[in-house]
Amino acid sequence: MVGGKKKTKICDKVSHEEDRISQLPEPLISEILFHLSTKDSVRTSALSTKWRYLWQSVPGLDLDPYASSNTNTIVSFVESFFDSHRDSWIRKLRLDLGYHHDKYDLMSWIDAATTRRIQHLDVHCFHDNKIPLSIYTCTTLVHLRLRWAVLTNPEFVSLPCLKIMHFENVSYPNETTLQKLISGSPVLEELILFSTMYPKGNVLQLRSDTLKRLDINEFIDVVIYAPLLQCLRAKMYSTKNFQIISSGFPAKLDIDFVNTGGRYQKKKVIEDILIDISRVRDLVISSNTWKEFFLYSKSRPLLQFRYISHLNARFYISDLEMLPTLLESCPKLESLILEMVKNQSTRRHGEKREPNVMVSTVPWCLVSSLKFVELKRSIPRYEGEMELVRYVLTNSTVLKKLRLNVYYTKKAKCAFLTELVAIPRCSSTCVVLVL
């Protein structure tokens, strides 16, 4: 010891620093625990005597009973939770019942949640689980997500705070049930209908003055009356499943079209979709969809999407040669996100052909407007990758940022970076980021 000063033990210092979270106010700790699953939240009771009962104050229940074999324990725990929150509010209830749905009294649990000012309700049940009528008049509900549930037909719907409605594989007794839910949600902003079992042959008449985002798939046909709609995501097989009836049009369109019909039917669908695309500023498109458009336009004048400024495209490697044509169709493009994926059919048939993206002419957007490009992939490096990077850097006059979201081993990355820095840049202000 020097100068009579006692050295602080490293373990004491580390222990003190690690326990800083315990010094936080209990309401803040409760908020932190709220964002964990209930299982992880309960585990914190073993940290210290202070933490022993903190999890009980969390205003939410996030359980996966499907992963547990002890039904009685789960039932007792859930009922105890509702009893302890009898006079308080519950912000979140998430239950993943799965195939064990018949072992739990789901209707009484949802009824209990609605009387405790529930805000977020997320229930994954199974085919014959009916949702109680109390859900239709829950005045505090903000976010409703149901999977594999069966809705009953309500006489009255009042959901004054509901902003997000997310239904997956949900069954309806008739075509008016979903319409009542939408019309009874005066502040609804987001609607997701995935594999929705809507009565066959019926078209959903969707009317909402507040809806901003809509996500539908091939199992439902929709006529949309939504003047504030900003983003429409639609997946289609053979036929177009939406029609927009309003003075405006969504700024963003996310289209996935897979053709399984005849030639005439396909031609009509493509023409309808192209009219819609010509009106948007932000487009998300899959490789299958663009390939259908590409083949359709071969004997026709070049497609022109004069309003598109943001493009997010997902391409199979074997279809990358279509990229220049797509860029030529977007003369005012400012932002491009391009994701490369492996073509499953190519892998299956052992085809090794790599595409060539080099063309004799440069698309107008590269010369005049393209400022941001992101290239990403979830596959091993492909043979034409560096040629694609070179194509962008050497032809983009006003490019400000090129982001390369790719994975390399340490050795391969060094070689990639060496080759990258040697590529001349048409834009002197371009910054290249390798993630």
From Swiss-Prot:
| PROSITE patterns registered for this protein in UniProt | FBOX (PS50181)
* Stored InterPro entries: F-box-like_dom_sf, F-box_AtFBL13-like, F-box_dom, FBD, FBL13/AtMIF1-like, LRR_dom_sf, LRR_FXL15/At3g58940/PEG3-like
Q: Which residues form the F-box domain?
A: 18-64
Q: Which domain of life does this protein belong to?
A: Eukaryota
Concerning SMART domains, the annotation shows: FBD (SM00579), FBOX (SM00256)
Q: Where is the FBD domain?
A: 354-406
Gene3D superfamilies named among the record's database cross-references: Ribonuclease Inhibitor (3.80.10.10)
Which of UniProt's keywords are assigned here? Answer: Leucine-rich repeat, Repeat
SUPFAM superfamilies per UniProt? F-box domain, RNI-like
Q: Where are the LRR repeats?
A: 123-148, 170-195, 234-259, 262-287, 314-340
Q: What is this protein called?
A: F-box/FBD/LRR-repeat protein At1g51370
